[in-house]
Every structure is written in C-alpha cells, then in structure tokens.
Amino acid sequence: MAIVKKASAHWEGDLKTGIGSISTETGVLREAPYGFKARFEGGKGTNPEELIGAAHAGCFSMAFSMILGDAGLKADSIDTQAEVTLDQVDGGFAITAVKLILKAKIPGATQAQFEELSNKAKEGCPVSKVLNAKITLEASLVG
C-alpha cells in the first residue's frame, strides 16, 4: 500500500525580492514564509534545505527506532540533527551532502550494535534513498 502525503508552495515575484509560502496537508506548516533571503542571507522564514533537513532527521530517527526494535532494543532518546549542504555546481545549485548527527541513549546497546544499527537506518531511511547526495553519519551513544 502506497502512502501519499501532500505539501504545496505559493510564490509571488522575482527570485531575490519575491516571497513564498509553504503549507502541508496536516496543517503543521500553514503558509510558512520562505524566500531568497531566508535561503541565502540568513533572513526570516524557512528554506527548502532546512525543510529537507527536518524531514531527513525525522525520517532517520523513526527508521532507527524501528531497526532498534527489530534488534530487541528500545531507545530512551534519539536526537538527530541534519546539516544540509547546498553548493554551486555546474549549471546551478545542488544539495551535495547531508551530515546526520545522532545522539541516542539506548539501554543495553553495545557500541558495535549502535554503529551497525545506526548505519542500517542511514541506508534504509526513505528520505536517504531519495537524496542524490553524500550522506554521512556522526553517531554518539550516550548514557
């Protein structure tokens, strides 16, 4: 069974001075502003790379939780940050890398298990699979 999720974007104006809004069908994002200044100049609002990072961090955390459960483990906490790199490449811009930074507290997990299972989650996460970028993982087992 396929799952279909929807999001929409509205844009007005040219690239540098225009403004857009992003919404999701769940309403979690409702006309959230985005634009050139937020993307390239640190202005207010969100940007596509930040949203991809949030989606990737969330997807990875859920995938890791599932993989831990399959291995008979349960995390007390999983904290994931995604650093998304946008680079200028031939003919424009591309997301060239995503660095996932994981800190997790997992009672009973060995360092070897943690490394194996977190890498399995990195490879198996649906958002990882859709990105054509180098994805690295910095993982810390805490507690």
Description of each model-found segment:
Residues 1-54, 61-143:
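Extended beta-strand/beta-hairpin segments
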